[in-house]
Amino acid sequence: MKVQDKQHIRAWVSGKVQGVWYRNSTRQVAERLHVLGYAKNLPDGRVEVLAYGDTEAVNQLIDWLHDGPEAAIVTEVKTKQVEGETPPLGFEVC
């Protein structure tokens, strides 16, 4: 796979996304898609997601972030391309 076929993004997910298994569910979906990165709670109530992998797989994860698990109520997902960072080795819940 060529490097240009990979995508590295950071996403910030707003809404009712803490205390609803959002991070663990994100990890399960990411692992199924073979996407590397992390999901972590932020002090302001959002969840930050770092994702690296095949462009199509990362796009599928981003689509899933807009819905999340059943108990979540997602109001906004902002994404930004990541450049110059070393790709992660796995997918972690922080």
From Swiss-Prot:
SUPFAM superfamilies: Acylphosphatase/BLUF domain-like. It catalyses: an acyl phosphate + H2O = a carboxylate + phosphate + H(+). InterPro entries: Acylphosphatase, Acylphosphatase-like_dom, Acylphosphatase-like_dom_sf, Acylphosphatase_CS. Keywords: Hydrolase. The active site is at 23, 41. One of its GO terms (molecular function) is acylphosphatase activity. Its EC number is 3.6.1.7. The keyword Iron does not apply. It is an enzyme of class 3 (hydrolase). Pfam families: Acylphosphatase (PF00708). The keyword Hydrolase applies. Residues 8-94 form the Acylphosphatase-like domain. Gene3D superfamilies: 3.30.70.100. Belongs to the acylphosphatase family. This is Acylphosphatase. It comes from Hahella chejuensis (strain KCTC 2396). The gene is acyP.
